[in-house]
Amino acid sequence: MQKQQGFTLVELAVSLVVIGLVLGMVSLPLMRQLNDRLGRVPGGQDAQDIQAALAMYMQTMGRLPCGSADAGGVENAGLSGRKVQFLPWKTLGLPAGYDKYGSMFGYVVDPGICSVPVQWGSLLDQSPVVNVEFWGAAGKIAGNAVPVAVISYGKNRAGTVDRNGLRFGDAAASAKEKGQAIGQSPAMLYGRVSEAVQEFDDEVLVLPALLLANRASLGGYPVVRQPAASGS
């Protein structure tokens, strides 16, 4: 039997340094821009609230929640993969699941991170099912494969519902917005980081696998790369 390989303390320490560099160069500037645009409204959520709730859930439960089937925000086991679901805001302990426009957040999560033990091998090898491109004034500026993404549908609110579950009209939506509407199964998610992007106004929050692995380890959950299946 092939022995499972875990990360040593040295490897985890090196990973944390890498996380810090990557987040400092890319993720945190994008997060600040996203947080500024989403804003904080009475009862609404900002990007930092959601990021903190997902990280804490990972540390406490050793996994991330599946999506919610409706705006009620309760995790529905099995709702994972490429299909866009509602953010499970109630399961995450958040007071609400909508942005400053009153629109419910979308949520996409890799099934490999929704159960214990987490399938860290594929997640850390940059092969999760959630693929995201970030777009600025000059076009695409970054692309990532990540375990989880949260979508804000912007001012036009195309592709989602309000806090009462009423669907917004999608007539003015671009192809990118229609493709990542709640209920769709997009191969790629698109998030803008500048208002100069006119094609779509959706914004996407992501958490990298290394950051989530660190939180799982802090919670006492082993971060193990499952060995590949051997041939007969």
What are these regions (language model features)?
Residues 1-30:
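N-terminal single-pass transmembrane signal-anchor helix
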Residues 109:
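Short, surface-exposed polybasic-aromatic patches that bind anionic ligands, especially phosphate groups
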Residues 32-34, 58-59:
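Low-complexity Ser/Thr/Gly/Asn-rich repetitive segments
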Residues 37-40, 103, 113-232:
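Short, surface-exposed interaction loops/tails
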Residues 42-45, 54-94, 114-120, 228-232:
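Short, glycine/small-hydrophobic-rich surface segments
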Residues 66, 103-106:
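A sequence-level detector of short linear motifs
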